[in-house]
Design a protein with these regions (language model features):
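Helix-rich interaction surfaces within compact, conserved domain-sized segments
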Residues: 29, 34-36, 41-67
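Short amphipathic beta-strand starts and helix->beta connectors
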Residues: 22-28
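Short, surface-exposed ligand-recognition loops at beta-strand->loop->(often short) alpha-helix junctions
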Residues: 5-14
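Hydrophobic side chains in well-ordered alpha-helices
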Residues: 16-19
Length: 67
């Protein structure tokens, strides 16, 4: 079991919500909204926390920035 905590101002609420919606069946994920950033905590088995999940959230965040 591993846990990742991703904290960065570029993670907008919509990108985090989209990532949780897409991969929530693979792991437990919670998001905490702060004033200028969001904290995403992902907990699950090693197979659930693969780079695909983290890259997906990064890609969504990048799309948010480009809009």
């Amino acid at each position: 079991m591993r846990q990742y905590e991703l904290t960065h101002a570029i993670y907008t609420p919509s990108s985090i919500d989209a990532g949780i919606a897409a991969f929530g069946h693979l792991c437990q994920a919670t998001a905490e909204r702060l004033v200028d950033e969001s904290v995403l905590t992902i907990t699950g088995g090693d197979e659930a926390l693969d780079p695909e999940l983290l890259n997906y959230i990064l890609a969504l965040a990048a799309q948010e920035i480009l809009r």
